[in-house]
Amino acid sequence: MSGHSKWATTKHKKAVIDAKRGKLFAKLIKNIEVAARMGGVDIEGNPTLYDAIQKAKKQSVPNKNIDSAVKRGGGLEAGGADYETIMYEGYGPNGVAVLIECLTDNRNRAASDVRVAMTRNGGSMADPGSVSYLFNRKGVVIVPKGELAEDDVLGAVLDAGAEEVNDLGESFEVLSEATDLVAVRTALQEAGIDYESADANFVPTMQVELDEEGARKIFRLIDALEDSDDVQNVFANFDVSDEIMEKVDA
C-alpha cells in the first residue's frame, strides 16, 4: 500500500473539520475556475471541470461559490485571476522524492513559499527533471469501501482501462492511465458505485519505506507545503505500514 495514498485520503477526510477548512475551500474553488477557463463552462464537454465541481461538492463547498468560480473562469463574471501551473521538485527527509504542484498568480511568492517550507522541514529543492522521472501521471479514483468488495470495483472498471485496484483500508484506489480517467469514472457511475474523488495525479514508480520518525518528518513537510495558498497538490514517493499510520494518526 502506498503510504502517501493512505495519508492523502485520511488527510482529505480530516481537512473539512479542522482549521484549514477555509484554505481547502479556496483551493477547490481555484481548481474550478482554472478548469472553466481552460476547457469552457459546459461540464458535458469539460470533464476536468466536472471532476473539479464534484470534488468541491463532496467537501460541502456552497453551490453559490462553485457557480461564481465557473462564471469567473468562463469570463462571465469579473474577478478571475490569471493563474498558472508550476511544478517544483525536491527531496524531503530520508531521501523521499517530492513533487509540488502550484496554481498561482504570483510565481515569485509561490517559489518563496515552497523553498521556505522545504528548508525549514528537512527538505531541499532539486533541479527540474531530477525528481519527476520517479513519477508517472495516472488517473486516480478513490472509492469509499462501504459494503463493496475489491472484485466489485475491479469488475466495474476493468474494461474501462483500469490497471489496478488497491485496498487503502477504508477505501479503494483505482489506477489507470490519465487518458482513461473519465472512462473509469464513468464506468463506476454506470455501475452505481459512488466515488470520493477522480484526479490525474503523479504516482511514484518506486517508494521509500519509512519508520515512525521518518513518517512524522515527511508529514510535517507536506503539511508545511500545503499551508501555502499557492500549493494545490504534493506528491511523494514514501510508504509506511498500517501500524505506523495508526501511531501517526493517533
Curated annotation (Swiss-Prot):
Keywords: Cytoplasm, DNA-binding, Transcription, Transcription regulation. Its main location: cytoplasm. GO terms for biological process: regulation of DNA-templated transcription. InterPro entries: Integrase-like_N, TACO1_YebC-like_2nd/3rd_dom, TACO1_YebC_N, Transcrip_reg_TACO1-like, Transcrip_reg_TACO1-like_dom3, YebC-like. It is found in: Cytoplasm. Coiled coil: none annotated. GO terms for molecular function: DNA binding. GO terms for cellular component: cytosol. Belongs to the TACO1 family. PANTHER family: TRANSCRIPTIONAL REGULATORY PROTEIN YEBC-RELATED, TRANSLATIONAL ACTIVATOR OF CYTOCHROME C OXIDASE 1. This is Probable transcriptional regulatory protein SCO1521.
